[in-house]
Swiss-Prot record:
Protein name as it appears in the record: Glutamyl-tRNA(Gln) amidotransferase subunit C, mitochondrial
Compartment(s) of residence: Mitochondrion
GO biological process: glutaminyl-tRNAGln biosynthesis via transamidation; mitochondrial translation; regulation of translational fidelity
Keyword Ligase: yes
A single cellular component GO annotation: mitochondrion
Catalytic activity, reaction form: L-glutamyl-tRNA(Gln) + L-glutamine + ATP + H2O = L-glutaminyl-tRNA(Gln) + L-glutamate + ADP + phosphate + H(+)
Any coiled-coil regions, as ranges: none
Entry EC no(s): 6.3.5.-
Enzyme class: ligase
TM region positions: none
Keyword Manganese found: no
Keywords: ATP-binding, Ligase, Mitochondrion, Nucleotide-binding, Protein biosynthesis, Transit peptide
Species name: Mus musculus (Mouse)
């Protein structure tokens, strides 16, 4: 049942969201930026191409770099595949929560075997800041300068 609700939610138009930013119009009145504006569609109907404006929007939202034509082609193929999934009839299909739903899983008790091993675990990281792992956002790599900074746990 929840799969139908989720599919309806995912099929909502892209322009349904509203923004909290505001702009002043020529008369000096403030108008919400998201009201009355439409977000660009991912792929225009009947076309398999993604506009440069949408690519820039996705790069900003997802912190992913679509700098090459190959990356844009991969995005267009992924969108085409997702469009094929919309054609699948899932009426009457129970949602699957786990591939092991028909089996009884025996869980072990949650006991701490070894404590105070944070320093040992943080040694596995390339870069640590204030006892936290640092990872690059998306496929944008950390600057080379960051890798040269000594971590606080290395001695």
């Amino acid at each position: 049942m929840w799969s139908r609700a989720a599919s309806v939610r995912f099929r909502a138009p892209l322009d349904a969201g509203r923004s909290f930013a505001s702009k002043a119009n020529p008369q000096g009145k403030v108008q919400a930026a998201g009201l009355g504006t439409q977000a660009p569609r991912l792929v225009p109907q009947g076309s398999g191409r993604v506009s440069p404006a949408v690519i820039e929007h996705l790069e900003r939202l997802a912190l992913v770099n679509f700098g090459s034509r190959e990356a844009v082609d991969r995005l267009e193929k992924a969108i085409a595949f997702a469009d094929q999934l919309h054609a699948v009839d899932t009426d009457g299909v129970e949602p699957l929560e786990s591939v092991l739903e028909d089996r009884c899983l025996y869980l072990r008790s949650d006991n701490v075997a070894e404590g105070s091993c944070a320093e040992e675990l943080l040694q596995n990281s390339n870069h640590v800041v204030e006892e936290y792992f640092v990872a690059p956002p998306g496929n944008i790599s950390l600057p080379d300068m960051v890798n040269k900074i000594p971590s606080s746990t290395a001695e």
